[in-house]
């Protein structure tokens, strides 16, 4: 479960960073794109996060929903349909 908590914390930091940056640039929306692979590196190209993850894929879905719900509770509009593609579309 520690790995899951680390994933959620990392995803949450990434979301916060991109959203704050988009707001500063007066963007109307931002796409959080998460890619899970066998690396433990951050790939900044195309704002895609790649982190090591080799356990139950269901935990990824749980983490995505947690992040989306967290953003929605902050008053942001979230596209839940994109979660299946490991993306979260957020309207600012």
Predicted regions located by residue number:
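Short terminal alpha-helical segments
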Residues: 2-23
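Protein-protein interaction and targeting regions used for scaffolding, dimerization, and localization
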Residues: 3, 82-85
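N-terminal non-cleavable signal-anchor helices
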Residues: 8-9, 50, 91
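Acidic, low-complexity, intrinsically disordered interaction modules
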Residues: 25-82
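A generic structural motif
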Residues: 86-92
């Amino acid at each position: 479960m520690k790995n899951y908590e680390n994933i959620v914390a990392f995803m949450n930091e990434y979301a916060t960073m991109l959203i704050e940056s988009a707001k500063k640039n007066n963007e109307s929306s931002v796409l959080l794109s998460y890619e899970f692979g066998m690396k433990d590196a951050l790939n900044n190209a195309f704002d895609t996060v790649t982190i090591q993850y080799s356990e139950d894929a269901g935990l990824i879905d749980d983490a995505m929903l947690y992040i989306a719900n967290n953003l929605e509770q902050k008053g942001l509009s979230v596209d839940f349909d994109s979660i299946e593609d490991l993306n979260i579309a957020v309207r600012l």
